[in-house]
């Protein structure tokens, strides 16, 4: 009873298409793709910022030890 078969998935997909229409689903898919791309870009920017901050911290530490 708890298993989801291929037939059930196809029926659910057909109902979703009937309820929302293909244009709305296409728009939703594009919006979702844009959101994922933005999220990945933000994660990469955060990683680059953290690495840059860590590198500048190491350089500042080297300068302070030269005194």
From Swiss-Prot:
Gene3D superfamilies linked: 1.20.5.3310
Family annotation (NCBIfam families): PRK01614.1 (NF002448), PRK03625.1 (NF002960), tatAE (TIGR01411)
GO biological process: protein transport by the Tat complex
Transmembrane regions listed in the UniProt entry: 4-21
Protein name: Probable Sec-independent protein translocase protein TatE
Organism: Citrobacter rodentium (strain ICC168) (Citrobacter freundii biotype 4280)
Membrane-topology descriptor: Single-pass membrane protein
This protein's GO CC annotations: TAT protein transport complex
Key words of the record: Cell inner membrane, Cell membrane, Membrane, Protein transport, Translocation, Transmembrane, Transmembrane helix, Transport
Domain of life: Bacteria
Family: Belongs to the TatA/E family. TatE subfamily.
Localization per Swiss-Prot or TrEMBL: Cell inner membrane
GO molecular function annotation: protein transmembrane transporter activity
General function of this protein: Part of the twin-arginine translocation (Tat) system that transports large folded proteins containing a characteristic twin-arginine motif in their signal peptide across membranes. TatE shares overlapping functions with TatA.
